[in-house]
Each structure stands twice: as structure tokens, then as C-alpha cells.
Amino acid sequence: MGKIIGIDLGTTNSCVAVMEGNKTRVIENAEGDRTTPSVVAFAEDGEVLTGAPAKRQSVTNPENTIHAVKRLIGRRFDEDVVQRDIKEMPYKIVKADNGDAWVEAQGKKMAPPEVSARTLQKMKSTAEDYLGEEVTEAVITVPAYFNDSQRQATKDAGKIAGLEVKRIINEPTAAALAYGLDKEGGDKKVAVYDLGGGTFDVSIIEIAEVDGEKQFEVLSTSGDTFLGGEDFDKRIIDYLIQEFKKDQGIDLAQDHLALQRLREAAEKAKVELSSSQQTEINLPYITADQSGPKHMAIKLTRAKLESLVEDLVERTIEPCKTALKDAGLAAGDIQDVILVGGQTRMPKVQEKVKEYFGQDPRKDVNPDEAVAVGAAIQAGVLGGDVKDVLLLDVTPLSLGIETLGGVMTKIIEKNTTIPTKGTQTFSTAEDNQTAVTVHVLQGEREMAKDNKSLGRFDLTDIPPSPRGVPQIEVAFDIDANGILNVSAKDKATGKETGIEIKASSGLTEDEIERMVKEAEENAEEDRRQRELVEARNQAENMIHSTRKSLSDLGEQVGDAEKQEIESAISELEQVKDGEDKDAIEQKTQELATKAGELAQKAYQQAGGGDEASADAGAGETASGEQKEDVVDADFEEVKDEDGNSRK
């Protein structure tokens, strides 16, 4: 069985890890980094870039570079938080036919899971390159406060990326696993404060030894799925726009290119101010007017930054209070505080956490990698590599139904350990009624309209009876992923009643299948494109090295021989810019053979003897290989040069 990998699918950055024996390993991507920007860019020629290459070109292509799409996953277009993002984001956020928030790039509308799938594919291929085998299964993390729609959308993203999501795990819980797996010293209660790029969570977790098994039990969780580092960056951007307007009289708020440069500068300044007291934001040629180009040079102090984001930091404390209250604990009952998410590197955040919990947070947990490491541990548990670990997570929000008067009646309370089941018995409101519609909700508000609608469930085929007589038991079943399933039974007959779920949002199975197919086709096209580029590069190298050899050998090459080689070069030049990879490789090989013969002859003339033929043969082999050996230029002409110098 292949490895199950652990993926932290973040708003700003993503990370992948795997269990190796009893150790976890965070895997570096193709760029050599342990985290990958959660950025996907769509170029005009149809090319799709993911990660660092996508982020690098964002300044010149802001409208088609999608970042922070996790903030939209599983959300309705009409939600206030989405409407707020529409004003902030350089790319288009559009309303899908089903009312969900989708994005648009290069004229194509895409669901957020479709975009997130690109990042997951990058994580998948990063793991495959390292492991040397295909990866088909993963544990993916989500913010603890994600609702049912957001969790389902994350599973959909995994499916589109070609991954079977074995488990959805909450980010703070994953961080606690990473922290607590190898810790000795008895039972303890820890608070995980997770302030990432787009979301904030806090979980209170009890780590205990029970019959030789390490048990991680989530006591409570709380948070805000629209508060994170992106909001901190936005405060800096707004400040820079305001200062520039004051100084130059020009408003940069409507200039997408300028905004993208400001976004990068704000992120960089924020990071720098975590370790220094002051930084300068220098952006030459940020814009221009009739008088010429304008440059931005603004000093930003740590104190100023802290005053700009003070209320955002303060906003994280309320969920901490809620989580402690729900767990029945006081701040003094917490033994350790773990910080997760890049934004927790900000000194002001650390100071606030210390002030509230009355202790210094732990410094031995990497805030960028802990979540992926925890996901890999959970993957190890599921794959049987990790023994004696039990994880007991909770549902973050209450589940219930709409009852008479538009009230929400809770069936499963928030912070209930999952998997769990809750039942409610319904009846009919009218005589001979054969169907009942049940409106399922998720949230903590009293009125149904103020909570998240998960769907309407039609119970059909009820035998005609006077009103109030039929007894229909509806069971709400939350699985270990925190995703809701529903079943119903007519108590009078014992017959199971099928429920057709008409989801108020989300992707249909057909849409997911289409996206899976497109993703597979894109992966195939991407591979074909890469191989074509490699073949062209190889052809270019072969032409260059052969011409260099001809030039170096000069008079030693006869006219007929020279003409034959020039003809082979010409034939290769004719095909190398085309789309036929096989033709390019064939002509490259033909030229390589002739170049090898040329090299052999030169060596023999120089007194190289039989060694030359072995070297020439090696040259030919190298010419046929893929990217790892794109040092074709080294294989013969270097030796030719040596040969010439010895002559």
C-alpha cells in the first residue's frame, strides 16, 4: 500500500509531510522550499502556474492570479465576508449558478475547490518526487471552525486533485499532535492558538496517557474563518495608499498593478518588522501622472504597524475566552500554549497571547510546519505506521433544524466529540401529508435565518395518516471528518426512508467528475508541454555543442563530413520549434550519432585511441536522456577541447 501523505492546505502557504518510520518529514518542493505559496496563475497561452512561479508573476498578471481562495471555499456569493473580498481582490469573484462564490480568470469561471486542487496537485507531485512512487491518499487539514460546506468543498478539492481524502483533520488538532506525540510528563491541557493567512482558530486540547495509549481529546474549539494575515497586510496597504495620496495627491486604490506591488511590499514589511523596529517601503515607478513617474518611499515602524492592527489582534481574544468557557476551564488551567500560523511570529501577537494566558507560548513548534506534520502523523495512524495514538476531535458548530416560527432547534451541540449521532422525531402538520421538508442548519444563533443552511431534506413516501400521527425519526450523523450525513426511518413500519439532499450550495457529483477529468487532462497536457520543452532544450544544446566542435576542429573535418553534419543540424532546426516531440528527439539523436562519430575521429587523430569511442558512446547516451542530464553540452566538446589542447 502506498503512503498516505499529510497536507496543510493553507490560505497563504501550503505544506506537505510524510511519516518515515517513527519520524515525520516535511518535504521540500521543486523550488527547494518547505512551504509552497497557495497561489495559482492562469496565463494567456493557457499555461497554469502554481506556487512560487505563480506568485512571482502576480505583479504583471494580477487579474488572473488567484491567491487566498481558501477564504471563498464553501461560501455563498452573497455572504458579507465575500462581498468585502470582492472589493479587495484584484481577480474577479463571481456568482455561480448555484449561488456559490466562484472566481474568474482568463474568461473562465472556476469553483474555489477547482483552484485549490491545483495547489493540492503540487503537494501531491512534491511528495511523489520525494517518495519515488504514486500517491493517491491524503489527510488534509482545515480550520477547526470550518462548517460542513467548507469541509465538503475541501474534500472535493482533494478528489479533483486525484487524491482520496482519508480524513479531514482540524488544524489546531494537527498542531497538537505534532507537539505532543513525543512529549513525556503526564497529562496536560494545551491551548493551540492558530492565526494563519486567512483564518483564526483556538482549540483547547487535553493530552493524556490512557492504558498506554496517547489520547488527544479536543475539549472545545472556537474561531473566526475570516481573520488572518491577509487582513494584517490589508491594513498596511491601506496605510500606504493613504500616505501616498497625502503626499502625491494620487489614489492607488484603483490601480491593480500598483496594488499587487503594494501587497508584496506590505507582506515583506510585516515580516521584517517582526525582527526589526523600522523598515522602509521603496517602490520606484509605482505610478505616473502628467509630470512624470512617481516613486514611493515610506518609513514604517513596528509601533505604527501595531497601532494599525491592534483591533485585529484584540479580535483573537474573544474566541479564546469562548473556547476556555466551553471547556469549563480558566486561563490558569492551561499548561502550554502552542502558536501556529505565520502571523503568530508578530511580537504583538505573542505579547497578547502571553498577557491573556499568563505564560510565554512554546517556542519549540514550527508555526509554518506543525499542521502538516500533525496531518502526516494522523496519516500514519490511519496507515497503521503510528500505534497507540487516539484522536478525539469535536464538531465546531451546533447542528439542528428549523422548527415552527423560524426557530433553530439544536440536535447536536457544538464541541460534541465526533463521530457522533443525534436523532429527532418529526411528524406531519396536515392530514394525509405524504412528504415533509426538513431544513438543516449549522450555527449558534437562535433564529434559523441567521445560521448556515446546509440543505433541505425531503422525506417522501409517508403513508397517508391524520396529522401528528406519523413518527419519523431523522438521524444526524457526523463522521470523523466533521461532515454530516442524514438518514430517516418511519418508526411505525420500521422502514428506512430515502432522503434526497438538495444542497443549498456546493458542487454536484457531475461537476466534480468534470473537474477531475479536466485536472487529469491538464496534468497530461502539462507533462506533454514539459517534455516538449525539454526536447527543444536538448536539441538546442546538441546544435550548439556540435557547431562548437566543428569550429574547434576546423580543418580536421572534411568538406563532405562537414556538409553531412550541417545538413543534420539544419534538419533538427526545422523541427525543433514544432510540436512533434518524437520528431525533435529523433533528429537530435541523429545529430548526436554524427557528432559522436566526429568526436571519435578527432580523438583518434589526436591519438586518443579506443578510449574515444567509449567517450563518444557515453555522449550519445546522454543526448537521449531527460532533464536530469541536460548537460549535453558538456559531454563531448569539453573532451574535444582537451583533445585539441593535447594535440
UniProtKB/Swiss-Prot annotation:
UniProt keyword list: ATP-binding, Chaperone, Nucleotide-binding, Phosphoprotein, Stress response
Stretch list, region Disordered: 545-564, 602-647
Record-listed Phosphothreonine modification sites: 199
Bias-annotated ranges (Acidic residues): 631-640
Residue spans of biased composition, Low complexity class: 614-624
GO-annotated molecular function: ATP binding; ATP-dependent protein folding chaperone; unfolded protein binding
Induction details: By stress conditions e.g. heat shock.
UniProt keyword Cell inner membrane, yes or no: no
Function text: Acts as a chaperone.
HAMAP family with a match to the protein in the record: DnaK
PANTHER family to which the protein is assigned, alphabetical: HEAT SHOCK PROTEIN 70KDA
Family assignment from sequence similarity: Belongs to the heat shock protein 70 family.
Name recorded for this polypeptide: Chaperone protein DnaK
Organism lineage string: Bacteria, Pseudomonadati, Pseudomonadota, Gammaproteobacteria, Chromatiales
Chain's gene name: dnaK
